[in-house]
Curated annotation (Swiss-Prot):
SUPFAM superfamilies: P-loop containing nucleoside triphosphate hydrolases. Probably part of an ABC transporter complex that could be involved in peptide import. Probably responsible for energy coupling to the transport system. This is Putative peptide import ATP-binding protein BMEII0205. It comes from the Bacteria. The keyword Lipid biosynthesis does not apply. Residues 64-314 form the ABC transporter domain. Residues 1-25 are annotated as: Disordered. It is an enzyme of class 7 (translocase). Belongs to the ABC transporter superfamily. It comes from Brucella melitensis biotype 1 (strain ATCC 23456 / CCUG 17765 / NCTC 10094 / 16M). Keywords: ATP-binding, Cell inner membrane, Cell membrane, Membrane, Nucleotide-binding, Peptide transport, Protein transport, Translocase, Transport. One of its GO terms (molecular function) is ATP hydrolysis activity. CDD domains: ABC_NikE_OppD_transporters. The lineage of its organism: Bacteria, Pseudomonadati, Pseudomonadota, Alphaproteobacteria, Hyphomicrobiales. The complex is composed of two ATP-binding proteins (BMEII0205 and BMEII0206), two transmembrane proteins (BMEII0207/BMEII0208 and BMEII0209) and a solute-binding protein (BMEII0210).
């Protein structure tokens, strides 16, 4: 079976009737008949009233919700006494709806990966609330509480080389979740591995090979196949294409889009590359110093960002046109051990006012978006 041909990030109108899972303006190619034939059926407290209605007004089922989510890291004793606590995630409220991709962007150290790890139970949260499929997860929930949710929420790591055991054949690695679940015979497990490898565009004969025999893009396909083994409903993709070159990034992004259309998946897509997030997301949340500063539909946020930090992020992206203006965000991200009293972006903001220095801005609903800024 030949390797899946190289794909390009798709632009332009390629079909007249986009699927309900597509981002605004996205026009992807339909799946092949073979891909459609082998598809796996998808598996079927502090918030203001106006914000709650905003989150639910589109009618889609919300399958992930966080309210005022906080994660603190205890760094030990202060020299002057007391505990030294780093707040990596500060009162983050997000939703992910069935069949959509939420892009989570921000600079390094903004808390993106920490949020993703809390949503799959790799890290406990300190305070706030996490609800998955309507079930509340306690801050330090035991493994038994997570067990019925494990197969429904899976994680795709940034470095596929580190995510795979170098001494384990890839077929065995893909089958590992099936072994843990323990509900398939050996023949059924082998058939499922073959199905998963075909699903991500790899020949089934590769199952006997070891990870070092594959390229970075092929290894990431293997990691995705393993994540799909138990028919999850949500994939948390933590910088899933950051370690790949541009051509491989395009292939993996298109693979994730195809899988979403075919299996009805929801994605939390964590990245710092704004171009990739724009290609794959339906909605985008912008994170700064552990706090959400703006969320909204992808098209609206990219065309007219409301928060000064969102604007600065987009303006800092290099453009291919010669002589195109490019602005660089002045200053550095504040230390999470000593954040400003008011708005965390205030020391770097060109539109800062006196109130910004003293009063943290609440997250306000502005049309179909939310923004934390005193300008609104």
């Amino acid at each position: 079976m030949p390797l899946r041909p190289a794909l390009h990030l798709r632009t332009g109108k390629l079909r007249q009737t986009p699927t309900h899972n597509e981002p605004d303006g996205w026009a992807g190619q339909p799946l092949s008949a073979a891909a459609a034939h082998r598809g796996v059926c998808p598996m079927s407290d502090v918030m203001t009233a106006n914000r709650r209605s905003f989150l639910a007004e589109d009618g889609k089922e919300t399958i992930v919700r966080t309210d005022d989510l906080v994660r603190d890291f205890d760094l030990g004793h202060r020299p002057e006494g007391g505990r030294l606590v780093l707040r990596a995630v500060d009162k983050v409220s997000l939703t992910i709806r069935r069949g959509e991709t939420l892009g989570l962007v921000g600079e390094s150290g903004s808390g993106k990966s920490t949020i993703g790890r809390m949503l799959v139970g790799l890290l406990p949260y300190t305070s706030g609330n996490i609800e998955l499929f309507g079930q509340k997860i306690e801050p330090r929930a035991k493994a038994a509480a997570w067990k019925p949710l494990r197969r429904r929420v899976q994680f795709v790591f940034q470095d596929p080389h580190a995510a795979l055991n170098p001494r384990m054949r890839v077929g065995t690695a893909i089958a590992e979740p099936l072994d843990v679940a323990g509900n398939l015979t050996r023949k059924e497990r082998s058939a499922r591995v073959d199905e998963l490898m075909e699903l991500v565009g790899l020949p089934t004969s590769f199952a006997r090979r070891f990870p070092h025999e594959f390229s970075g893009g092929q290894r990431q396909r293997i990691v995705i196949a393993r994540a799909l083994a138990l028919n999850p409903e949500i994939l948390v993709c933590d910088e899933a294409v950051a370690s790949l070159d541009v051509s491989m990034q395009a292939q993996i992004v298109n693979l994730l889009k195809d899988l979403q259309d075919q299996l009805g998946l929801s994605h939390l897509f964590i990245a710092h590359d704004l171009a990739v997030v724009r290609a794959v997301s339906h909605r985008v949340a912008v994170l700064y110093a552990g706090q959400i500063v703006e969320t909204g539909p992808r098209t609206a946020l990219y065309s007219d960002p409301l928060h000064p930090y969102s604007r600065a992020l987009l303006d800092s992206v290099p453009r291919a046109r010669r002589g195109a203006p490019r602005s660089i965000i002045a200053g550095e991200v504040p230390s999470l051990l000593n954040k400003p009293k008011g708005c965390a972006f205030c020391p770097r903001c060109p539109k800062a006012m006196d109130i910004c220095r003293d009063v943290p801005p609440p997250l306000r609903v502005i049309g179909d978006r939310e923004v934390a800024c005193h300008l609104y």
